[in-house]
Amino acid sequence: MFATQERLGITLENLSVTTQRDYEAMNAPESLANIPKLLKNPSLFREDALINGQWIKASANQRFLVRNPATGQHLALVANLNTADAHEAIQAAEIALSAWRGRIAKERAGIMRQWFELILANADDLAILMTLEQGKPLAEAKGEVMYGASFVEWFAEEAKRVMGAIPSSTWGDKRTIVLKQAIGVCVAITPWNFPIAMITRKIAPAMAAGCTIVIKPAEQTPLSALAIAYLAQEAGVPDGVINIVTADSEQSIAIGKVLCESPTVRHLSFTGSTEVGRILMAQSAPTIKKLALELGGHAPFIVFDDADIDAAVAGAMVSKYRNAGQTCVCANRFYVHTKVHDIFVEKLAAATKSIKIGNGLDQGVSQGPLIDQQAIEKVERHVADAISKGARLVIGGKRSSLGGTYYEPTVLAGVNSSMHITTEETFGPVAPVIPFDNDEDVVKLANSSQFG
């Protein structure tokens, strides 16, 4: 049963353009922000969930608070859906599947292309929304919007190139034909660190193949998901093809279980922690779902004695400090040959010192806050453990004077394998430098990770 008229959301009114006073109001933590005033297209700001093409409130009429990690500002009160709503979203996707799968590839590609164009046209607003709820600098957010849009563009074209095959038959009087068809209803559970790109990377191939999808965005960053879903609607994506199920951390656990255990859902894609990935895999096992799990990372960065040190430092800066180190593919362990160790540490520290910390909406800021208190506490534990076991603090190593969840970009030298930071994913702006002498040994060290 789908949403009744009483559960439909209220259409936002057109509001004035941004003024300095509007911007300053965003930093007043005592009141709910007026985000539409910051946007050229205020309709992008959505607080209700999307099921079967309708913007709905939660069936239990509950909401959860979304905060700006840079200021503590209350941004939005988003619909806090429950398991009944999750079942409704799955049903909507199931009903929409036949018609969407039945459309010719060119039609699906055309709708997706229109969606891509709308994302580009609203890129500035989408970047503002992302910076507000996630904290990353505006330039990084804009880059992610473009990166996320590229998935839609790519798979819009690939939709027209889904081809089967006619392999040689083992029987002379028979012909073997291989057809590629949409698997069915898909689920995407997405992270907060890349709240647009990780959604489009999952939605776009599913849509191109003819699948419908239910998306459960991270509770910290639902506004970006709702905004791009609105643009999908505007592009002509039929009702039920994309469904957004928003929920807080408590409801998310129960909703995740429903999505995993539903026999209607044929494929589940998840980007997040290894711990949660294990749970989702176990919950999906009874229905033998296809799974795509992108879990934790602990990537090594190796600098040999014949390396161009300036180039190595430049690469390290991009790899380590993007998104305040909150990236599953960023470098977490810096193995540096003893012959170039000191000069590398010196130059890396100098480059790190130039990073400007602050609100991602402010001019010139290159590192925003960590997403929440839990994140910054983990960074503090890793740094404290390393120093207690003999690591040398070169720069940073503490919370910023800005307060909140800002943490100074940090370089540690003299790190060794006894420290948690070498075996666990820190997910923060800390570069631990580990000296090595033997090339064969460092390759073994680089590969000695439970994360692969």
Language-model regions: role of each:
Residues 234, 251, 275-416, 438-447:
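ALDH superfamily catalytic-core signature
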Residues 72, 108, 130, 152, ...:
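Residue-level signal for inorganic ion chemistry
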Residues 1-78, 110, 114, 164-189, ...:
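Terminal low-complexity tails and localization/encapsulation signals of metabolic enzymes
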Residues 65, 79, 101-102, 134, ...:
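A structural signal for short, well-ordered beta-strand elements
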Residues 73-163, 173:
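Glycine-rich loop-to-alpha-helix module at the N-terminal edge of alpha/beta enzyme cores
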Residues 164-311, 436:
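Rossmann-like NAD(P) dinucleotide-binding subdomain of oxidoreductase/dehydrogenase enzymes
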Residues 97, 101, 116-123, 127, ...:
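Structural signal for hydrophobic packing residues in well-ordered secondary-structure cores
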Residues 365, 404-405, 424-430, 449-452:
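Conserved glycine-rich beta-strand-loop-beta hairpin in the small C-terminal domain of fold type I
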